[in-house]
Amino acid sequence: MKGDFAPKYARILDILPSIAECADGKLVLVGGTALAIFHLKHRLSVDLDFATLGDDDEAAKQALKGCLSAKGVRAFRSKFSNQFIIHFEDTSIKVEVLPPSFKVNKPEWREVGGSRFLVASIEDILRMKETAYAERKEARDLFDIMFILKSRGEPHLRIRSMIKKHGAPKSMERLAAMVFSKEDFEEFGREVSDASKTGS
């Protein structure tokens, strides 16, 4: 783990109990952080993404931000209307509340610091990650997809198909700094290389 990623991840773990309490069963943690902390523990993640169970993402964002601020968390507006930034002495974390169009079909309850907390299921995260890779081709999204498939004992053929359809992943160096296991990253690199060579 290199650069700024380790302190960000540590701060996410520190603040999760407060996040869980403030989410109040109305927000669902999604994305790489949900996958990494609650499902696979395969890499670190450095931001917090939420889907709302209601139809007003702005109100949900403001409620979360206000609750955290009341707990003494330093939360500030972002240049993007659906985000805010939590500042710590050594780093900062982006918090984003996605629009209601991002649906979570099977949220799961988890216990965090004595509070119940909704987290997206691995099936929901897989669906969202496939959409994300098609849109931005980030290596971390494809890495997450590969390890979801691996956790379910499924072959990696879908990885090769996605590379063929959408192109090779970018930001491999950034991903390398996020992955816990060097062997996992090397396995992913081989899959990407083989897919690029065979075109299938």
Language-model features, listed with the residues they occupy:
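Compositionally biased terminal segments of proteins
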Residues: 1-200
